[in-house]
Regions:
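Glycine- and hydrophobic-rich flexible loops that cap the catalytic core of alpha/beta enzyme folds
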Residues: 1-202
C-alpha cells in the first residue's frame, strides 16, 4: 500500500478503538483457496484477493510486538503482550522454516517480511515498500497506547470468501474483484496468472 492508504487504515484503527459506539469496521474482502497442502498439520491457503491489506495489518502487528518488547510495556490482563501478538497473528510457534510464518509473500517481499518477523537485519535485496510501511507504523505505534491499537485491530472486519479449487476459477475471480478497485499493473495480472497455474511449492 501507499503511505496515504497506510495512514487511512491507521486513522480508522484509532477511530474505532476510541469510539464506544463502533463495534466493527469493514475493510474489504479476503478471498482464498486451499492449496491442498496439509503436510504441516494445518491447511495452507492461497490468498487470491486481499494480500495488501493482510500484509499491512501484519506490519502493524509486528510494529506493535516490537514496541512492547523494546519498552517493556505492560497493560491489562487481556491486553496485548509480545508473546500473545506473535502467537495469535504472526507465527506458528511450533513450526520452523517456511512453516513458521503465518503469512508468506512472494519471494522478494518475503525475505524482508521474514527479517522483520525474526528480528533480523534486512536482506541485501530489500523490499523498499515493506520496509517503508513497517517504519511508518513503527513510528506511530510508539505514540499510542498499545491497548488502543490492539482493540482497534480487533474490531476490523473482512468478508471472508473461500473458493473451491475444483469448481471456481481463481484467476477469473481475481480479475473481477479488482476490475473496479485500485488499478493493477500488467505485471500484477501476469504474475497472478502464472502463479495460479504453478504447483503451490513452486
Amino acid at each position: 500500500w501507499t503511505e496515504a492508504q497506510c495512514n487511512q487504515l491507521w486513522l480508522d484503527i484509532l477511530r474505532i478503538a476510541e469510539d464506544p459506539t463502533t463495534r466493527a469496521h469493514f475493510i474489504g474482502s479476503v478471498v482464498y483457496v486451499s492449496t491442498g497442502d496439509t503436510s504441516a498439520g494445518f491447511t495452507r491457503w492461497l490468498l487470491i484477493d486481499g494480500q495488501q491489506r493482510v500484509t499491512t495489518i501484519m506490519l502493524i502487528l509486528i510494529a506493535l510486538r516490537n514496541h512492547i518488547e523494546e519498552t517493556g510495556w505492560r497493560g491489562t490482563e487481556d491486553g496485548p503482550t509480545a508473546k500473545r501478538v506473535e502467537a495469535y497473528f504472526l507465527k506458528n510457534l511450533e513450526e520452523e522454516g517456511d512453516r513458521c510464518p503465518k503469512l508468506v509473500l512472494r519471494r522478494h517481499d518475503q525475505a524482508t517480511l521474514r527479517a522483520l518477523l525474526d528480528r533480523q537485519d534486512y536482506p541485501a535485496d530489500i523490499s523498499a515498500r515493506i520496509r517503508e510501511n513497517y517504519e511508518f507504523f513503527r513510528e506511530r505505534v510508539a505514540q499510542v497506547d498499545p491497548e488502543t491499537i490492539y482493540r482497534g485491530i480487533g474490531r476490523l472486519v473482512v468478508v471472508d470468501v473461500t473458493l473451491d479449487r475444483l469448481t471456481d476459477d481463481p484467476q477469473l475471480i481475481f480479475e473481477s474483484l479488482n476490475s473496479t478497485g485500485m488499478d493493477l499493473s500488467q505485471s500484477d495480472l501476469i504474475r497472478n496468472f502464472v502463479l495460479m497455474r504453478l504447483p503451490e511449492r513452486e
